Swiss-Prot record:
Gene3D superfamilies: von Willebrand factor, type A domain. GO terms for biological process: RNA polymerase II transcription initiation surveillance; snRNA 3'-end processing. It holds the Pfam family IntS14_b-barrel. It comes from Rattus norvegicus. This is Integrator complex subunit 14.
Length: 515
């Protein structure tokens, strides 16, 4: 999931820190050191993740928009200036704006807030914001909870004793509570020094940025993979004492099924499945990135020459048009499938079903599915013309078909011109002419645009009078017939599902296309 790093650059972050040695450090230097450690870890293990950098004092500024270039993020850390007082609310408002603008309100996001625990003074301070949050209108509401799924991690450049001497810790804990309890506060254990800052950011990495490695198994075949993004624990609301369910690190394929049978099932989340190549010494080759481009290229070349079950599975699913059912845990399944990014690129994906013995009702209980060879006769038929599972409804779903949209006048003009072009090529274009005519008729009836039907009918009658002497006799009959049917469709007795069919005449030959 995307990450927004929010860095405090107020004057309080310039307070000096007594560190052993001659070099003088400020709290912002400790924060930059910790963030550098985080960015280096993400560049190695989370290189597909998008990260943005925001700085704030009384105002906020987007230093680096969402990017996968962690060198740019690290350069921005060394180019930050010092500003005035702390105003956390403005920073949180900025986070809301940039996340919603880039990702909308449905994509989960992690927010890493780096501050020294100073809440600001006067109007705009966190104390003032929390004290007045219940006295505001909807237009000026406090930005927490975020309007998107999120986790808020507060990294304090202060130890616990320093925060407890004031009400800073209590106010910061209130932020986590306002975000529906999603998040955590981290403080420095012991004196402020580089080592303890590394330890604090290490705890954040262990909690939120540890890559999920698993073993993908199918019979005797196995492959080490990374699942990205990391699957989150799932809590079943119906249970009296809900316990978060975590997927196993052993992902076992239990069977294969046609894409048409599984259709488009409801899923909890979707993840990339990336192979991890190991060399003979057991070190990872295909995961992460190296500092030197030549070393990276040579490592990728070595990884590409090693046979990998993950690659075999991906290619097989893509060619055969099937998905693999995978066991995630006790009574918990998912599916592996090939998803195309473009015409030339596709990825192996894994979607997680809801836990339970029967996540997809039309398949029945997962434990009762078996191989085709166990059936007395092929449940798909000899010609693969039937399915053992309940058939999908014949009516097309509204979201699964191309609909006619006339937002701009040019769209309507294009559809009318298409009908007229086909009308001039009758009878060769009879089938296409009536197809476009029926599409326009249904759209006009759906929108209540009856005047359009009358106007197109008049155009067709005019086209009939302009036919040259060399025109096929059937063209005039078809145009007159189509115009009459459109006029009937503009009355209150019109039937939406009725299609206008070609008029059968004695002039209709084998060259005329039939509906």
């Amino acid at each position: 999931m995307p990450t927004v790093v929010v860095m405090d650059v107020s004057l309080s972050m310039t307070r000096p820190v007594s560190v052993e040695g001659s070099e003088e450090y400020q709290r912002k230097h400790l924060a930059a050191h910790g963030l550098t450690m985080l960015f280096e870890h993400m560049a190695t293990n989370y290189k597909l993740e998008f990260t943005a950098l925001v700085v704030f004092s009384s105002l906020w500024e987007l230093m680096v928009p969402f990017t996968r270039d962690y060198n740019t993020l690290q350069e921005a850390l060394s180019n930050m200036d010092d500003y005035d007082k702390t105003c956390l609310e403005s920073a949180l408002v900025g986070v809301c704006n940039i996340v919603q603008q880039e990702w909308g309100g449905a994509i989960p996001c992690q927010v890493v807030l780096v501050t020294d625990g100073c809440l600001g003074i006067g109007r705009g301070s966190l104390r003032h914001s929390l004290a007045t949050q219940n006295q505001r209108s909807e237009s000026s509401r406090f930005p927490l909870p975020f309007p998107f799924p999120s986790k808020l991690y507060v990294m304090c450049m202060a130890n616990l004793e320093e925060l407890q001497s004031t009400d800073s810790l209590e106010c910061l804990e209130r932020l986590i509570d306002l975000n529906n309890g999603e998040g955590q506060i981290f403080t420095i254990d012991g004196p402020l020094c580089l080592k303890n800052v590394q330890s604090m950011f290490g705890k954040l990495i262990d909690l939120a940025y540890t890559p999920f490695h698993a073993a993908l198994k199918c019979g005797h075949l196995t492959a080490d993979v990374q699942v990205f993004p990391r699957p989150e624990p799932f809590v079943i609301d119906e249970e009296i004492d809900p316990i978060p369910k975590v997927i196993n690190t052993d992902l076992e394929i239990v069977g294969f099924i046609d894409i048409a049978d599984i259709s488009s099932p409801p899923v909890l989340s979707r993840h990339l499945v990336l192979p991890i190549a190991l060399n003979k010494e057991g070190d990872e080759v295909g995961a992460g990135i190296t500092d030197d481009n030549e070393d990276e290229n040579s490592a990728n070349q070595i990884a590409g020459k090693i046979p990998n079950f993950c690659v075999l599975l991906h290619g097989s699913l893509k060619v055969e048009g099937m998905v693999a059912l995978v066991q995630l845990g006790p009574e918990w399944h998912g599916m592996l499938y090939s998803q195309a990014d473009s015409k030339k690129k596709s990825n192996l994906m894994m979607s997680l079903f809801e836990p339970g013995p029967e996540p997809l009702p039309w398949l029945g209980k997962m434990a009762q599915l078996g191989p085709i060879s166990d059936a007395k006769e092929n449940p798909y038929g000899e010609d693969d013309n039937k399915s053992p599972f309940p058939l999908q409804p014949k009516n097309k779903r509204s979201y699964a078909q191309n609909v006619t949209v006339w937002i701009k006048p040019s769209g309507l003009q294009t559809d009318v011109q298409k009908i007229l072009r086909n009308a001039r090529k009758l009878p060769e274009k009879t089938q296409t002419f009536y197809k476009e005519l029926n599409r326009l008729r249904k759209a006009a009836l759906a929108f209540g645009f009856l005047d359009l039907l009358k106007g197109v009918a008049d155009m067709l009658e005019r086209e009939c009078t302009l036919l040259p002497d060399t025109a096929h006799p059937d063209a005039a009959f078809q145009l007159t017939h189509a115009a009459q049917q459109l006029k009937l469709a503009s009355t209150e007795y019109a039937v939406y599902d009725l299609n206008i069919t070609p008029l059968h005449t004695d002039f209709s030959g084998s060259s005329t296309e039939r509906m």
